[in-house]
Amino acid sequence: MNENEQPAFWPAQGNLHQGRVFVLKEDVIFTVLAQEGGIAWMNARHPHSGGSFIIATAVSDEEEERATRLLKNEFALRDVLQDSWAIRAVASTQYRGRFALVYAPFSFELLARRAGRAISGIARFIELAIQICVPLRQMHLQNLIHGDIKPGSIFVYHDATCRLGSFGLSCRFSDAFSQTRLTVSGGTPAWMSPEHTTRTQRPVDSRSDLYSLGMVLYELLTGRLPFELGADDQTNWAHYHIASEPLAPDVIRPDVPGMLSTILLKLLEKHPDNRYQTV
């Protein structure tokens, strides 16, 4: 289905953009597309018309409270997100008693599916890296902080352009500057900036997203994260982000140009003042 088409049972477009609650019909068939951070993305298909849409909801009862908090924060920001760079929810609903967001259908591949595999050519890496930077730059120009940049929040379209999703931790600059943590607590430890942890008193701003971007790009280029933790060491990510220095990418992968290696290491600077200041 073309992403601009809408099924016959889809509510009026104007109502959707007003944040109308969308009531799911009983005969809709759901198929899990991806799971990330306690949230499941599902394709919802009407068996008679063949029309479809996408919903996001908690993966389990155990994750429901946190996932609902994230989804509601994302929904509250829907009017400042733009379709040109964001996967934007257009309505909310209930799925099996759980809060859920509704999205128009779109074709994508989560960048997380490529995690752990280094991109084979430097030119291909640079092309993808630029496409990842484009929506993040647009988001920052809207005075918004993402707060959870990771492979699971980056959507790669069939034409290789990228969109951002998973805005559960996102907030406006003005909200972030008033505190040391983001508006909604949480995050994904492996990609979290030092200031986003509980162990520093530095405010979280857009440069926190740049650190997380550096983590994402480092893994795409080298096939591994800057810090390798054992299965029993996963609770210590904050320590590694604050106190450990990553190996230079050109040490891990000799074909990486020195300048590119330097760029990634600058993104991963511990203090935000020492990073690039904008995308």
Language model region names:
Residues 44-68:
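ATP-binding glycine-rich loop module of kinase domains
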Residues 65-80:
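AlphaC helix of the eukaryotic protein kinase fold
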Residues 82-91:
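Conserved HxN/HPN-centered segment at the entrance to the catalytic loop
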Residues 96-110:
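Conserved short submotifs of the Hanks-type protein kinase catalytic core
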Residues 128-129:
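Activation segment signature within eukaryotic-like protein kinase domains
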Residues 134-144:
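Protein kinase catalytic-loop region centered on the HRD/HxD motif
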Residues 190-279:
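C-terminal lobe helix-coil module of Hanks-type protein kinase domains
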